[in-house]
Amino acid sequence: MKTTVILLLAIAIIFAIMTTLTSAKNEETMEEALKGLNELKERLKKQGIDTAALNLDEKLLT
């Protein structure tokens, strides 16, 4: 149950980052979004959750 909630939260955060990047007009915003994605990945790794899907999203963003 806890893992499901965390994964749903991660998906929501990824969607928010993707939306931000779609409307981003400068590179600072993109860098902040990528930094946020990396921080999310680190938190999920500490909890033992696979972050392979997030790696795909990061490749799409760059």
From Swiss-Prot:
Signal peptide: 1-24
Subcellular location, record wording: Secreted
Tissues/organs with expression: Expressed by the venom gland.
The keyword Isomerase belongs to this UniProt entry's keyword annotation: no
Residue stretches in coiled coil: none
Gene Ontology CC: one annotated term: extracellular region
Keyword tags: Antimicrobial, Secreted, Signal
Keyword Secreted: yes
Family indicated by similarity: Belongs to the formicidae venom precursor-01 superfamily.
Function summary: May have antimicrobial properties, like most ant linear peptides.
Descriptive protein name: U-myrmeciitoxin(01)-Mg3a
